[in-house]
Amino acid sequence: MDARFRTITISVAAAAVLAAGCTSSGSSSDSTSPNTGTSGHSSMSQDPGTGPDASAAAGLRATLTALLSDHVWLAGNALQTAVLKGGDLKDPAVVGAVKALDANSVALSKAVGSVYPDAEKPFLASWRQHIGFFVDYTLGKATKNAAMVTKAKSDLDGYRTAFGQLINSVVPELPADAVAKELIPHVQSLFDAIDAAVAGSPDFQTKLAAAAEHMVMTADILAGGIAKNKGLDGDVDGTASTTRSVLTAQLNDHVWLAGNALDTAVLKGGDLKDPAVVGAVNALDANSVALSKTVGSVYPDAEKPFLASWRQHIGFFVDYTLGKA
């Protein structure tokens, strides 16, 4: 999927939904919290706007949500591509997917470096290292090399500890043990997605979406520590900030799930009944339902019309794809 198209789509969609969801007449905020769900890029040093959703703290949380969500999707797609190409890391499709993943790692390190300059390079080195361990796990699973799988798991356990110490050395408000513990679901959920990819399971996209969903919590924890450390204005966990983060995650996921479902349909020759296509479409629709429930949590009467409209526009993209194919 073209990265520029994905970013533009997220930005436009996020702006439209946020305009409807965060600026109701007669009230600057809503006391009803949205449903947490699956996963807009902005500067971590974003200037405060006029509302609580535009505070520096809210912007930080949304930025980390987007970047960390993309990390999971890009990692999952790169690893699945490697599996589909028989583990050939020199295949052009694999090389392209890995480059896109590394570009996200660089962007994430630069976001960290924008507030902690000395941490940018160590963060990038550490982040790239843990991706390599996931590659080892994937290749071990694909080749049925139990020793390789075991070592990859051990390496990732050690990485969690080292990464926690790195973050704590920069942000004392975030205990090393807590950061390491927070990474457990990230590692396990990505293991689950990789296992599904290696097995050719139709629920691969659902597993990957679950892994991406965890990044909402990870971003919240990291943003909370950084905001406190830097004295950023706004409330990281306020209703407006949470709404922005959830919508960022869900709209991000929408584009990834739609792109992956359409790509799967093309790879399967347009057979919409193929199990892999059905699984990808089901994962995409689950995201649509989650997004409609977020809208419905603040505007109950809009939930069903929103879902119907959202599903309709996805159908148009399916028609376009089948027409092109």
List the predicted regions and their residue ranges:
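C-terminal motif of bacterial Sec signal peptides marking the signal peptidase cleavage site
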Residues: 18-21
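Bacterial signal peptide processing site
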Residues: 23-26
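Ser/Thr-rich, Pro/Gly/Ala-heavy low-complexity intrinsically disordered linkers and tails
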Residues: 28-43
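Immediate post-signal-peptide N-terminus of mature secreted/exported proteins
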Residues: 41-96, 228-279
